[in-house]
Amino acid sequence: MSAPAPEATIGTLPSLLGATREELGDALAAIGVPEREIRMRTAQVWHWIYFHGIRSFDTMLNVGKGLRTTLAAHYSLERPQVVSEQVSVDGTRKWLIRLPPVDAQDRGAEVECVYIPESDRGTLCISSQVGCTLTCSFCHTGTQKLVRNLSAREIVSQLVVAREKLGDFPGLVPPKDGLLPTEGNRPITNIVFMGMGEPLYNFDNVRKAVSVLSDGEGLSLSRRRITVSTAGVVPQMEALGREAGSMLAVSLHAVRDDLRDKLVPLNKKYPIKTLLEACRTYPGASNARRITFEYVMLKDINDSPAEARELIRLLKGIPAKINLIPFNPWPGAPYDCSDWDRIERFSDIVFNAGYASPVRTPRGRDILAACGQLKSETEKLRARARLLGED
């Protein structure tokens, strides 16, 4: 179900961007930094990479010139390439990011990353895989085959790239177009692993990435503001809560196994009862750290009042909130979005039972950046490569 994730690129110096503290310390030891200085030097370099967002080792003013020169001779701070940036009429931004090649056969995989600004927050939706194995029938990403896992460094680099584009490092200027939060001083306040891929099929790299994203001396995002979404990879859920400490979101979308088998085929392996048992024992779940259940509203498929009442019954005893997601269309999609009055009635039933049931406002539909619409250009690149190979 998973694919290996790379750490270094071919033909270039390895990038330290995205490295954990341990990996950064190992990199410094490998170029001759004395053991007694490793901890101090790691803290210095870490601060420059993740707090200041530097692109060159030469800008590390409190690090000696000799070490800066040695670092530059052996490592880089290379970022992925932003192939395109689209800005929606509602201020949502979507970046197509091309990752450096990892071997001679790799032509540069691509992922999509989405920024959703609101008045009081800015949410970055990041990817954990190139493509996906799950083939959820309502999701555009599910129509793209899995290419490979992203490394922890590639996951972290999505936030670094986004912060650069939004002027969110010292000395950078925010963009003039689009929207940014008007309350507070941080354009990116939340991260959701709801982009391309199933995060729990890339658990080790997601866990490592969360440790970098949440480090208080660098990128400094609270783990309570990092949400990992899963379609229900039950064996990894407990470990996610215990080792990553992030918030959990579950892509539920149905209250009957026969329907969920079609919408989320993973349900055949981990049916609803098994999934909800794992939610009940999720480490740290409480009224202050509720599990989010995502429920896409599909016209005449899963949107009846009876299904709303069954959802309430299923979630009894779980600290939960339910995000109702109007279906976002994509080319060739086999579903339609529920009528608005149907969505509101469903929401009212759930809310009156004591569960928060916000209806997610569709964002970025005009640039295919909304929930369920992401699909990279990697497949097109591979198709072109095959055609070139046949010439």
Swiss-Prot record:
Its main location: cytoplasm. Keywords: 4Fe-4S, Cytoplasm, Disulfide bond, Iron, Iron-sulfur, Metal-binding, Methyltransferase, rRNA processing, S-adenosyl-L-methionine, Transferase, tRNA processing. Binds 1 [4Fe-4S] cluster. The cluster is coordinated with 3 cysteines and an exchangeable S-adenosyl-L-methionine. It holds the Pfam family Radical_SAM. Residues 118-368 form the Radical SAM core domain. HAMAP family: RNA_methyltr_RlmN (MF_01849). This is Dual-specificity RNA methyltransferase RlmN.
